[in-house]
């Protein structure tokens, strides 16, 4: 008879395509993993893996079993967590996918208090591009996603829970550093360090500049970088000026760059939490969702203060 543990072992082996890595993930020995896989193969009377030396790949039968195993293991986890929750415990493993700024500056702040409130919950946070986080949410590889834009799929529910201010920063020796503010058209005279197209910060800056009659193509781009921290440090080194999340500024370069007000330009990006509405949620997932979306969440209210004034 099948049991959830056997399928859990198969799932680890199928996802890693390496019995040794699967053993490390499960805190088992490699021979034990092999034995569980062989037991499953005997049960179904068909091979689940093709083995060639150290190379392993799934057979057609293994490919067919993979999504069913995910469902079975997930159901087993939910059963265990549900029964434990009847005793009042919020427990289980929480998987969160995050785009860059939420993952580095928001989620750790939220999880710190949430895990103190619910010590039987384990959490894993994966920081990646926004679209990748949403893809993992769609596939069920993470329970929740935090990102700077919503996906309008009918399969998802999104809730805005934070607004992240975006500031223009310049090197301390830049002519703008000593001024009270600049007019939008003066931006065309600067060398900019920009994020890549498609990220949340880029989109927020693009939309804001269009509101004052400036397109991104009009900006003089000195450098394009893949994360806000690198951009802030590049500004500190005098390479150019940049629009960056104030959370990044206050935690990384607050005293090493100058903030410049652009008249008529107020930039921010909304941060959302999303979940898949067709997948049953565990007690831990529901608790974290309620914790993030509640209006009196103290850590969120602290984050919503202008970081450079806090």
Where are these regions (language model features)?
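Short helix-boundary/capping micro-motifs
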Residues: 11-29
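A short LG(V/I)-centered, amphipathic sequence patch enriched
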Residues: 15, 41-60
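Hydrophobic hinge/microswitch elements
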Residues: 129-134, 138-142, 147-148, 201, ...
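Beta-alpha-beta core module
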Residues: 154-160, 164, 179, 229-278
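Flexible hinge/capping segments at coil-to-helix
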Residues: 156-193, 197
């Amino acid at each position: 008879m099948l049991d959830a543990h056997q399928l859990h072992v198969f799932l680890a082996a199928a996802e890693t395509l390496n019995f040794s890595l699967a053993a490390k993930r499960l805190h088992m020995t490699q021979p034990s993993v092999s034995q569980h896989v062989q037991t499953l193969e005997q049960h179904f009377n068909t091979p689940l893996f093709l083995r060639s030396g150290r190379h392993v790949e799934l057979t057609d039968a293994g490919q067919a079993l993979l999504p069913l195993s995910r469902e079975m293991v997930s159901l087993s986890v939910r059963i265990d967590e549900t029964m434990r929750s009847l005793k009042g415990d919020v427990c289980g493993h929480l998987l969160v996918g995050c785009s860059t700024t939420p993952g580095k500056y928001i989620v750790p702040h939220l999880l710190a208090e949430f895990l103190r409130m619910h010590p039987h919950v384990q959490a894993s946070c994966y920081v990646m591009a926004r679209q990748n986080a949403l893809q993992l949410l769609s596939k069920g590889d993470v329970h929740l996603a935090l990102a700077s834009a919503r996906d309008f799929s009918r399969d998802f529910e999104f809730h805005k829970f934070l607004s992240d201010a975006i500031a223009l920063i310049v090197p301390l020796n830049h002519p703008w550093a000593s001024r009270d503010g600049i007019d939008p058209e003066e931006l065309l005279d600067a060398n900019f360090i920009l994020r890549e197209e498609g990220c949340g910060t880029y989109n927020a800056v693009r939309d804001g500049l269009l509101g004052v009659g400036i397109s991104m193509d009009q900006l003089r781009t000195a450098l394009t970088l893949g994360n806000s921290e690198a951009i802030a440090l590049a500004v500190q080194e005098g390479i150019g000026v940049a629009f960056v999340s104030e959370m990044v500024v206050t935690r990384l370069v607050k005293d090493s760059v100058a903030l410049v007000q652009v008249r008529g330009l107020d930039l921010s990006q909304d941060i959302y939490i999303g979940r898949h509405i067709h997948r049953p949620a565990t007690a831990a997932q529901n608790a974290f969702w309620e914790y993030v979306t509640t209006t009196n969440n103290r850590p969120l209210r602290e984050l919503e203060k202008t970081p450079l004034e806090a």
